[in-house]
From Swiss-Prot:
Keywords: Ribonucleoprotein, Ribosomal protein
Name of the encoding gene: rpl30e
Recorded family membership: Belongs to the eukaryotic ribosomal protein eL30 family.
UniProt-listed Pfam families: Ribosomal_L7Ae (PF01248)
Name of the protein described by the UniProt record: Large ribosomal subunit protein eL30
NCBIfam families: PRK01018.1
InterPro entries: Ribosomal_eL30, Ribosomal_eL30-like, Ribosomal_eL30-like_sf, Ribosomal_eL8/eL30/eS12/Gad45
Length: 103
């Protein structure tokens, strides 16, 4: 089992990601996103939108076990982050989640 918080920090340092609902949806629609991670407390309407676009683009979506505050903290930010799209995993092994279930 990988430590998702640690892997997110590795992606932030060595790869590329986008944070936020609009930017993540844009990355999904442009075909840039390889993996989408959503906080557990994302509102249902946003969750449905992200999941719909991800399904159309065949991008795996995972639910982070924590809240948006905790997801923001995992990325060393002092604000909420509801959705993160992984563009380039860098040196992390976060893409191993693409074959699993919820995080």
């Amino acid at each position: 089992m990988i430590d998702i918080s640690r892997e997110l920090q590795v992606v932030a340092n060595t790869g590329r990601l986008t944070m936020g609902v609009r930017q993540s949806i844009k990355a999904i629609l442009n075909g840039d996103a390889k993996l989408v991670i959503m906080a557990a407390n994302v509102p249902p309407s946003i969750r449905q939108d992200v999941e719909r676009y991800a399904k159309l683009s065949q991008v795996p979506v995972f639910t982070y076990a924590g809240t948006s505050w905790e997801l923001g903290g995992a990325l060393r930010r002092s604000h909420k982050i509801a959705v993160v799209a992984i563009i380039d995993p860098g040196e992390s092994s976060i893409m191993s989640l693409a074959g699993g279930a919820n995080v």
